[in-house]
Amino acid sequence: MRKYLLSALLLVCSIAFLSAQSREGLTEYKLENGLTVLLWEDHDAPDVTGYVVVRAGAVDEPAEYTGLAHYLEHMLFKGTQRIGALDWEKEKPIYDSIIALYDQYSDATDPKIREQLATQINECSMREAKISSTEDFFNMLDLIGAEGVNAFTSYDLTAYHNSFPAAEMYRWLTIFSDRLINPVFRTFQAELENVFEEYNMYANNPSSQAQKQLMEDIYKGSPYERDVIGLPEHLKNPRLSRLIEFYNTWYVPNNMALIIVGDFDSESTKPMIAETFGRLQPKELPSRPSYPSVQLTGKKHYNLGYNPQVAWVYPGLKEGDADQDVLEFVCNLLYNGQTGLLDQVNTKGDVSASYAFLDARRNDGRLIVMAVPYYDANQQMFESDKATEAIVMKEIDKIKRGEISDDLIANVKHMYAQQYKAFNETPSTKMNVLVDAFTYGKPVDDIFTANEKIQSLTKEEIARVAKKYFNADHMTISFDEDTKNMKPKTLPKPNIKPLDPVKNAKTEYAEAFQKLPKGELKQTFNDFNDVKISSLGENVTLHYTPNNKNDIFTLTLRYGVGEHEMPLLPYAAMLMENAGIMGNPALEGKDFDQQIAQLGAAVSYGCNDSYFYISISGEDENMNKIMNLVNRQLLMPYLEQKQLDALKGNEFFSRYSRQKRTAVQKSALMQYALYGKKSAYLDEVKFIDIWNMDGVQVQRLIASARTYALDVFYCGTLPEDKLVPELPLTEGMQPSKSPFLQDRVTYDKPTVLFLPNSNVQQADLYFYINGRPYDIASDVQSDAFNQYMSGGFTGIVLNEIRVKRSMAYSAYGVNTTPELPGKDCYFIGYVGTQSDKVNDAISVYMDILTDMPKDSTQLVALKAALKQAAQTAKPSMRSKAATYEYWQRLGYNDDPSKVNAAAIDALTFNDIEKFYEDNIKGKPVTIILMGDPKKIDVKAIEKELGCKVTKLSPAKLFNSTQELMDAVM
């Protein structure tokens, strides 16, 4: 006991030291206009990430106009009275007319009048497109080398973000503040179509539909009950004036934050922020309404074509509540992916899966426990909801009664401490906690004291909070495996003409922006010598990366054999995830997990076509004890029959039901198109072989895999001479043939493969072209082509498909390179669109492939993007070794960004054209399509492409289910 208390005291002291260390580089202040500014320097980051966060989301919308927050997120990329304006004086009357027409459209009920108004809006939009440039904002961001330009909307916030080089700080601050001054919501009608496509995309997903139904029930009477994207009846009846009103109400500096994380200097940045964001005008915010919380009682059941799942939902709490940290800790006692009470149930195989989490929001919250029932392959049925509930409630009752072991509490506290130690490793983690703190009004200091509070939690306090929330009434909601999907509403294709904007139009804003001052781009390169490579014997290589941040190690053992040579190995790896250790008595899997967790460690297994992986993490001081346990598990894995049965049942159900699941059908269609009879769904291990697996076979498979060439990737603080004796090395390792790359089907003429599916709400349309053998000498040209084709909204594909024609929410086209030089590259394009737009989408995409639109004015911005991408290709400390090994396998003996720098500087638009002509132009195109046959004109496709459409059935893409029945009989 004294030893435990001493360890706990040392842990708290080390956390207090880390708190001061973790704060380093963080600055928090407010501008005079009320804008919150959070700056966090991280000089290990490859670039800078900037966020503008608005404390407003779907929850702040009027009930009669849902979807406004998300609409606004889309529209705030369209420019202002300066950005994107070619002639604002001429444009303004047209813009005002569009606003007025939408008011009339929203009020009208006669379909004919609405159609006439929609036509008028379309005509005005086309006129406006001739005197404006919605690409202006994206062009400027491309010019400064911005990457990941995007935004997202949730219930409680909206955020706009991207990364950029520190040298472009002033120009980034300028355009990100300018976008908030007098915004103009151009092409509103066209962008609505893109939102419709996004809505249809979610309607296509049974998982999204299950979540939608769950939220409707557990947040009844609150804005949280509806999707962020909005209700379909409101999406079809927009009012632009209400969007402007929403913007004017909530997008004010005293309701916003500017958050910057990365490699920059805060002191030199502050004056720039004051000059740019200080221009925004504050405004008094309206009071937010409160909503009564629904009584959570009773049971509900739905058929959604979704895997059987049961949810038990309890009243939770709001973000920032005094109990929040403790209740989240309680959830981790139930489920943390390793040692929680529900984790132990999962490990034993009593259920297919179970987990618990706290869904805390600004105005309300829920405590949610979910489970997927055990599937019995012999009975060919899932265990009943009642039986599943009994298993889960047994564990919840332990929490309610305060029957929580000291070891479990200590393990979860240790997990928190480790997460806190690793907190400073990634800039994205820093950004996420700052966004969360601002959104919910939490003191930033809480970030650094939360873990200290967790370490000081008493068992009595944990029990008090657990009883308080889990003793409340709860609602039970279940979904079953009925694959007769509920068909949600979809939004129809409108009759509007595509926009035809002025090409290469340059605004006054763009000309002025290019003249703004910028710093000197700092060039830093990866040094392969950061990773020490040593031979530990024949076919055994150590890749050693020192950890200079903390005492947490990561160790990956990669054996050179995978599913291709050992088809049952992935299943053995899955079983090892829950294995214990043979003995007298045997150590069960749940007890193995507990012992590993007590050492502050985690172990996982994985397998792909080429490799078998063992991944281990923990504290270096415990390396010997951790590896002792892992070695024993590897040599003598112990599996209970229920664990074997659970894996077999899950695989049986997966194979039995997959022909009816649209997401799996799409995957199988692509596999068939690319690999033919070698598709992963056809060339798969027979189920009878899985059915006959036992613990002895698992032991043999793991032992056999460990005889292949081994790469050891270590990041930690132990010196090599202390590390090597702990590794599970064996002699006589055989050479590896990995990585394995399956040869793809070669198409020598135009081909269309069509999988008809009347249940899909959105069609999936792919374009495939066989390529040439890969050589790193063509990397710059390939990257330039990909940037030109799919570099965000200025890329040819998205611009033609989405921006101009509103055919799809998602569209791209890229040249894909393999993992090995000499293997063939290939082009893959994609459009996700409504089935009634498929014919038009094929025509537009084929025009792009047949005669790629030429726009040499993009070259400057394109090269800036390539340089920035090269500069930010900096692997994290823990991924350096694997990344460098991959680059060397491709043929690089130095950092690719250094090797390719001169080629990027010398790049011309002719190089992009030549790459297109050599690899795309005139090559046979294979179209791969899944959609509703009632809405797709197959004859028109055949006429346009000059080839027959090959219709496929699910039976062609999957093996027969008869072998499943034969195995279990």
Feature-to-residue mapping (PLM):
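Positively charged n-region of N-terminal signal peptides that target proteins for export
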Residues: 1-4
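A common structural junction motif
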Residues: 178-185, 277-284, 393-404, 631-639, ...
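Bacterial N-terminal signal peptides
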Residues: 7-16
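Hydrophobic, small-residue-rich alpha-helical packing segments that form membrane-like cores
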Residues: 187-192, 209, 223-234, 240, ...
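Proteolytic maturation boundary segments
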Residues: 20-39, 265-303, 309, 315, ...
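M16 family metallopeptidases and their MPP-like homologs
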Residues: 40, 45-61, 67-69, 85-178, ...
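A conserved hydrophobic secondary-structure block that centers on an alpha-helix together
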Residues: 237-249, 582
